[in-house]
Amino acid sequence: MKLAYWMYAGPAHIGTLRVASSFKKVHAIMHAPLGDDYFNVMRSMLERDRDFTPVTASVVDRHVLARGSQEKVVENITRKDREEKPDLVILTPTCTSSILQEDLQNFVSRASIETEADVLLADVNHYRVNELQASDRTLEQIVTFYMEKAKSNNILTKKTIKPSVNIIGAVSLGFHNQHDIAELKRLFHDLDIQINQVIPENASVHDLKNLPSAWFNFVPYRETGLMTALYLKKEFNMPYIDITPMGIVQTATSIRSIQKILNALGATVNYEKYIDEQTRFISQSAWFSRSIDCQNLTGKKAIVFGDATHAAAITRILHQEMGIHVAWCGTYCKYDEEWFREQVKGFCDEVIISDDHGLIGDLIAKTEPAAIFGTQMERHIGKRLNIPCGVISSPVHIQNFPLSYRPFLGYEGTNQIADLVYNSFTLGMEDHLLEIFGGHDTTEALSVGISADDSLNWSDEAQKELSKIPGFVRGKVKRNTEKFARDCSKNLITLELMYEAKEKVSS
């Protein structure tokens, strides 16, 4: 556990609650003190959803600490079973309530005697995993529970006559998740592949027994769904694809993988004509990447940071499809470091694996890229440094839960990404012209560091002179001047010192 005012991935119970609240008729009981129960507010604010968040907090208070939790937890489970009539109730502690070391499995066993619904305890180690790992594990746990139940009842499922697919990993609060799933459905329709099930978003737990009817499983995001796909592969020999169809190249690779699996299973399909037609005529990004507009971005410096799936995909797109120089890319998914490094090998100068936003901020300041592609935190950092930022990954705020159709996957997603990339760069002398003519976004000279450094002061005259320098080189001038001042052991940067630094650099 660590104290932080910003986390890229939240605590484990948030991942469990995201999966639970994605299913239909599943209710989650969160065994937690006040302060850990912010999920309801967060989901209600961000998700464009008409329904209430199906999560109830069983509050750990002084009475619970004195008498124990069993009576209260069991009462909350049975009460919600009567009121909501769910198919499944999931009990999850938080990292805080886990300290009590209570036998929650015993509470679940006791409650399940009195309830119509199934009752499960989320099998997650709250000290060792984060939100993303917990969501992956919880989804696998729920699927396993209902598949084992179906086996014990001798429920056998046959494969569908036509090729079909399960889409695994559509989770509440995902980044452009609903739009991506809609685009994937459209893609599979074009390929004449039936959708067997989409889980967990709007799925019923009673339908999970039909998952093996599909010919294969499709996992668009590594963060949630991979463990479920591996379980189904092991138990039912179901092949799965985990190549994210993001960008022209990876979308084609993903479709060819589908073609290979279907042909191996007895179908006869050839999607090469479809790939060619979509790439050349339907997707706008292929010709746009060869246009003079996009060629203006060739060699521009960018950095990428986000979850493993999105950061790896965007890095590939910037380098392969748009000719943009990626100075470094990184992910906060430290547990997936090996896969991430393999995916971005040769597409960037350096790989950063960290969940420390302070380190990431300082690296961005030092790199001085023309554009940032990251999370909500990188957007904040970009605003402080006056560097434009395109948001490409969770965690995000409400701007990235749009009502309009904005997928990142499939061929329509390539258009969305091309727009985002192009519009994220400050073009030509735009920044300088805004300052000259008193534009809407005139800013004072900003520091090129995020970490606090109060050892140097600028005189009013020096600040005024610095503000006259065009924005696209101002940061470099400021950094060189401050380096010169430190070398000279000066604490105050004056106009004279600025000119001395300029002469030193010029020579």
UniProtKB/Swiss-Prot annotation:
EC number(s) reported in the record: 1.3.7.7
Record-listed substrate binding positions: 428-429
Alphabetical keyword list: 4Fe-4S, ATP-binding, Chlorophyll biosynthesis, Chloroplast, Iron, Iron-sulfur, Metal-binding, Nucleotide-binding, Oxidoreductase, Photosynthesis, Plastid
The protein's enzyme class: oxidoreductase
Residues annotated as transmembrane: none
Keyword NADP: no
Quaternary context: Protochlorophyllide reductase is composed of three subunits; ChlL, ChlN and ChlB. Forms a heterotetramer of two ChlB and two ChlN subunits.
Function: Component of the dark-operative protochlorophyllide reductase (DPOR) that uses Mg-ATP and reduced ferredoxin to reduce ring D of protochlorophyllide (Pchlide) to form chlorophyllide a (Chlide). This reaction is light-independent. The NB-protein (ChlN-ChlB) is the catalytic component of the complex.
Family: Belongs to the ChlB/BchB/BchZ family.
Name recorded for this polypeptide: Light-independent protochlorophyllide reductase subunit B
The organism of origin for this protein: Porphyra purpurea (Red seaweed)
